[in-house]
Amino acid sequence: MFDLTAEEARLLLNVALMAVGRNRFKSAAKLLAVLDRFRPDQPSVAVAKAIALMSAMQDGAAVAYIDGEALARFPGNPMLLAFKGLALTRMGRGADAREPLEAALRGEDEAAAQLAAGLLNG
């Protein structure tokens, strides 16, 4: 058995996100599964899974994943909340998106707050 260093995990996460960008969702899912196994404490992997689902036009699945698994593991994570709000907005559920976006805006993650503010004000 082996472990991944933090740098190796970052590299794999970047490769997974590159695969998402090239619509290679199965490859990305495999890489993210490996990362999730070896770095289960990293919310960035959960965020990347949500991004992959949304990039595959599976916004409902992204919301279900965020609600059912990701937020259970990382309660109140601002970036997960921001992406939940984005997915709900893309699904035409703006009223439902408001609560997670406002929570992301109040969080300590500046990037999540910027995303949330853009969606709330856009």
Regions found by a protein language model. Name each.
Residues E8-K30:
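Alpha-helical segment of the N-proximal tetratricopeptide repeat
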Residues R10, S44, P78-M79, A113-L115:
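Start-of-helix register in tetratricopeptide repeats
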Residues M18, A52-L53, A87:
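Residue-level signature for tetratricopeptide repeat
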Residues F25, D59-G60, G94:
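TPR-repeat structural position
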Residues F74, T89-A111:
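TPR/TPR-like (Sel1-like) alpha-helical repeat modules
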